[in-house]
Each structure stands twice: as C-alpha cells, then as structure tokens.
A protein has these predicted regions:
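Short, charged/polar micro-motifs that form catalytic or ligand-binding hotspots
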Residues: 25, 29, 33, 53-60, ...
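N-terminal leader/signal peptides at the extreme start of proteins
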Residues: 1-21
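N-terminal single-pass transmembrane signal-anchor helix
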Residues: 17-46, 67
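N-terminal targeting/regulatory segments, especially signal peptides of secretory
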Residues: 313-315
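Intrinsically disordered, low-complexity regions enriched in Pro/Ser/Thr/Gly and acidic residues
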Residues: 116-310, 319-322
C-alpha cells in the first residue's frame, strides 16, 4: 500500500512538457501590440497635431473670407443707397464658429463671435473739421463739424479663434476696416473708406464713417451663425475751408497698433500729395482691467474740402446653428 501511494506522489510531481508553439504565439502577439502602439503614438503625437493645425489654419482663412463678405455687403449697401433712403434688402453673411476636428482622435476647435453696438466708450471713431460756414445761432465763430453733431461712429464685430495647434487669432470689423490680431502682432487686412487727393492747390479728403447698431451679443461654441446687416440710413455732407483747416481723426480701439500703422502708411504714400510736415499720427494707451485700449489721433493739415459720409448699419446674429 505504501508503494502505491509513493508512486502516486511521483506521478503528481511529474513536470509537464514545455509548449514552444504557445510561447512563440504569445511573444508574436506582444510584439504586434508594441508595433501597433508605436505607430499609434506616432500618429497621435505627430500626424494629428499637423492635421489639426491645418484644419485651424483653413478655418481662420475661411473666417477672413467671411469677414470680407461682411465688409463687401455693407459697402455695397452704402454705395447703392441714396441719401436718407432706408435699404430694403438685408445682407446675410454666414460665420462658422468651429474648426473641424479629427474623428476619435481630436475634437473640433471652438470659436467665439462677439458684437458690440455703438456706445460712448469702446470702440469709437470721430472726426473734427473747422468750416467756412457760420456757427449756429447763439454761437460765435465758424461751424466746426465734430463728434457732437454727426462726426462720430462706433460698434464692432469680432471673432476669436481659440486655436490649440495654430496660433490664436482675433479678427475684427470696425469702422469699415478688417483687422487681424494675434500673439505676435496685428495688421490691417482691409482699411476704412478714406481717400486723400490733391487737385492743384486744393487738398481734398473723403471719409465714410460706419456705425454698427443692435443688441450686444456673444456666441461661442460650434456650428454656423448668421449675421444680417441692414442699412438704416446713409447721409452725405460737404464742408469747405478756403484757408485750409486741420482735419482731426480720433480713434479709440483695442487695435491701436494696426490703426497707427495703417494711417502712417496711408499718409506716407506719394498719391496723397502730402509732405511729412502736413500730417501727424500719435498714439496713447490706457488700461481698463486686463484690457489695453489705444487712442490714435491723426491730424491732416491744410484741408480745403472735406466730404463726409455717415452710415448706420443694424446688425443681428442668429442663434440657429447649421
């Protein structure tokens, strides 16, 4: 009986044969998994960022095009209107808020569209020009056209792209100009409506001021929003100063560098007929919270004729996403 029990113990402790095929299969699976994870890491760390950067870049280029359509539509309304006539056809401009993502690997990049109606603070644009006309009854001297009697405009439309891979950018439309701002600076993509010409000894300046009015709104997230522009009125005035007066343009904006560079380049151009002694551009800044505002003052001397157009445009932003 003891011999049989010992035989059983020996039998239980017998070592099983090593399965080489199973080991090879396990190692092959692990190696394949490592190769897959390596390629997945390369895809997510290199290809996905490049893909998303391209998506965000294309989206910002699309926003620039959409802001160009907005400017073109408003300019067309003003050009095609008669003085005092209310435009009957509104202009619709779609604005896509987001940049496309990469399915599974990267979410879409959100954007923010903001509208600020004309107001006494930011932003505003005013002009001042002394004329040959007599001052209104009860006032002495000559009439001065300025911000108190029709020479002031305001309002802005802005888009902020919260890009994660491409540089973060803000695009703004104010007083008929399109401005691009980013972390390393800002530039004027399309200027306001202004023309400076010299006919003989007569210096002529023509300016169109555009005021945006409506309900202040900020919409962020995804989808496409609709911006509707309607011309409320457009007026034209012509002022003269036979001896040549100083035309002063004052701008209060967050994008002071772009405005300063724009006017400096404009007034330096040979086509204006101005010498460097006949114009001046100065800029000052002030801090409100964490936002810096700039006051840009432009003075053009010896202006004989000032032609001024003032347009009021109503802006609405639709909530429905597409």
């Amino acid at each position: 009986m003891q011999i049989n029990n010992f035989a059983k113990i020996i039998k239980l402790k017998k070592k099983k044969a090593w399965n080489e095929d199973g080991v090879a299969s396990t190692i092959g699976t692990i190696m394949a998994l490592l190769v897959f994870l390596t390629f997945l890491g390369m895809f997510t760390n290199q290809y996905i960022p490049a893909w998303m950067e391209d998506n965000e870049n294309n989206h910002m280029n699309g926003i620039i095009q959409q802001f160009s359509f907005l400017k073109w539509g408003i300019d067309s309304l003003i050009l095609n209107s008669d003085e005092g006539e209310v435009a009957s056809v509104p202009i619709y401009t779609p604005m896509q808020l987001h940049a496309e993502g990469v399915p599974i690997f990267a979410s879409a990049t959100v954007g923010r569209l903001s509208f600020v109606s004309e107001n006494p603070s930011y932003p505003w644009f005013s002009v001042s020009f002394p004329t040959d006309e007599d001052a209104p009854a009860g006032e002495s001297g000559n009439f001065v056209f300025n911000d108190t009697n029709g020479g002031k405009a305001g309002g802005s439309m802005e888009f902020y792209g919260a890009n994660r891979y491409y540089v973060q950018q803000t695009l703004a439309y104010e007083n008929g100009a399109i401005i691009l701002n980013q972390t390393d600076g800002e530039t004027m993509l399309s200027g306001m409506a202004i023309r400076i010409v010299k006919y003989g000894d007569e210096q002529i300046v023509k300016i169109t001021q555009i005021s945006l009015t409506g309900t202040n709104r900020t919409i962020g997230g995804y989808g496409t929003k609709g911006v509707t522009s309607t011309l409320e009125y457009s007026t034209y005035s012509k002022f003269e100063n036979s001896s040549g007066g100083n035309l002063t343009i004052s701008i209060n904006s967050r994008f002071g560098t772009a405005w300063e560079d724009y006017f400096t380049n404009l007034l330096s151009a040979n086509s204006t007929g101005l010498t460097t002694a006949e114009w001046n551009v100065t800029t000052s800044s002030s801090q409100v919270g964490d936002i810096t505002y700039y006051s840009v003052t432009v003075i053009i001397q010896g202006v004989n004729v000032f032609e001024h157009t003032k347009a009021m445009v109503a802006i609405t932003i639709a909530d429905i996403s597409v």
